A protein has these predicted regions:
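A short, conserved, highly charged catalytic patch centered on acidic carboxylates
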Residues: 1-112, 120-177
Length: 177
């Protein structure tokens, strides 16, 4: 029921005048709640986590990074979510590169990167980024009703560990063939 209300809401929004904060507050925050994440729980949300960049190769014009969201499952970060402004419909490889730097930080070590500008949400596996323009899962306004269950299976606090386990088993099976 709540998922249906969210997808109905999603289909109606014009994100063209949304800045990054609007995307975060009006779209991502409710989505994280539906996915089962909440502050001060075992499946919590770390917001705007600031981290120091210590390695010279990490420092690309800055010494600190700030991660928009790092949802946790059993207090461990499996993924990060980076919000992007809605006034730019297409996210690009620069957005993914920024998020990759965040996800691979030694204090985070996330398995998945999620980029969201409201128009669409893209999920990348940190260890399987072969094509920077092709996420392993993408959902947009136009297909949110048909793909929301799959999004839930991948990112929800209840199902992510099982999804990750299946993904690892599949990769291992391919490797051992």
């Amino acid at each position: 029921m709540i998922e249906r209300q969210f997808t109905d809401f999603w289909k109606k929004i014009d994100f063209s005048e949304y800045n990054e904060m609007d995307i975060r507050e009006e779209f991502i925050a409710p989505l994280l709640g539906i996915l089962g994440y909440s502050k001060n729980t075992i499946n919590g949300i770390i917001r705007e986590k600031s981290l120091e960049l210590t390695e010279p190769f990490q420092r690309v014009g800055r010494k600190m990074i700030r991660i928009d969201y790092a949802p946790t499952i059993r207090l461990k970060s499996f993924w990060i979510l980076e919000a992007k402004p809605g006034n730019i419909r297409q996210m690009d490889s620069g957005d993914l590169l920024q998020a990759y730097l965040y996800a691979t930080h030694p204090e985070i070590q996330a398995e998945y990167i999620v980029l969201c500008n409201g128009w669409k949400l893209c999920i990348y596996d940190v260890h399987q980024i072969n094509n920077w323009n092709k996420p392993f899962f993408e959902i947009s306004q136009s297909d949110c009703e048909s793909k929301f269950d799959e999004l839930f299976e991948i990112l929800s606090a209840k199902t992510m560990l099982a999804f990750r386990e299946n993904s690892c088993c599949n990769k291992l099976e391919i490797l051992l063939r």
